């Protein structure tokens, strides 16, 4: 039998080397374009999990003792290697996820490299405080947590792995990372790159598997902290398991974000933001602004330009750099999205975008724009995670803020207006962890990212991420003797 196109050396990466255990359940990595099996792996058994834990515990202490600047240099070298191999990594990500190569070349490994570089630079600046109390004084030490667990999602596999690994390793922790079983491949490449950059064996380990593997890891007494990117349902389950052992968690979960367009907005910029916030990665982005609120005075011009640009989006082979929209990650996920579309029509929403001819295969879905959407419709309340935009009308500022906040989610929001006083006023009033003004879905490594309400706990990226991967120790020094 021929070796699958993207077959890794083995399923797991532990203690600086690839490890296989074929007794674990089979995991098939499938190219969603045509259903081709591109890799066959095996989920972790309890034996594999214990090997990863033992390796990480052993390596973490020595890694933490290294000078922070030395840890930073390893991360910086890894960033350089990732950039040098950006095309190779992007091709792998496109085959595993179905996302267009035009996206993966600029937004996946590249973003991961930026994060490694950012935290590589921060590592040498980690410090505590000194406080005087008369002649006595207190100083604080910022210490690593120990062995951290990262659990990834299938939409940005290598980016998420790097976003979790970079701050953890910069602070002197070890990390065990479990990729999504749907897209298991690129995290293994990150582990190889970190090792090549000089990361000691065991500091970053990869174990494969489904939710049962994540649950076993999250409840393991050796795990000091859990960071997960995924659905609200999965996040609640993992957070509950972690908190049973009094472990801190960082959760980046789902969203139903509002993108608000005022009458005075630049139409072209607002349409660009809405397209980016609904159809990039075929809509499979947690922070997408899928509730597009249009003030009535701009509605007609906005929709006319939007529909013209949506009609021009190229759907096709994701390896073609001219392609704008590829398949969804799987046929099963495509069917889930189609169910939401059908339900929206039953509930009275009107589909504006004309039907498109789709390539052969079971994972494709055309971009959809719904108008006549009301706040009570399922489409306006639940996360679809596909190329489906809901357009809602509004009259005034107070009305739209109240409606934008009327959701269990709080990941992100966008505001398009020329009135920056109004924009800053709304940014303060909107219940969201991230607000973009006259832009959307831009996430530089130096910007903290995360949600409130049911969209998550804690933040990824930015200097604040250091707080989530360290613990403070206070040392009181008496000068009375």
Curated annotation (Swiss-Prot):
GO BP annotations listed: glycine betaine biosynthetic process from choline
Residue sites binding K(+) 1 per the record: 29, 96, 182
Protein family: Belongs to the aldehyde dehydrogenase family.
Quaternary state and interactors: Dimer of dimers.
Free-text cofactor note: Binds 2 potassium ions per subunit.
Modified residues (Cysteine sulfenic acid (-SOH)): 286
Protein name (record): Betaine aldehyde dehydrogenase 2
Binding-site positions, K(+) 2: 246, 453, 456
Record: residues binding NAD(+): 152-154, 178-181, 231-234, 254, 286, 383
Cofactor: K(+)
Pathway: Amine and polyamine biosynthesis; betaine biosynthesis via choline pathway; betaine from betaine aldehyde: step 1/1
Biological role stated in the UniProt entry: Involved in the biosynthesis of the osmoprotectant glycine betaine. Catalyzes the irreversible oxidation of betaine aldehyde to the corresponding acid.
Domain of life: Bacteria
Stored HAMAP family: BADH (MF_00804)
Gene: betB2
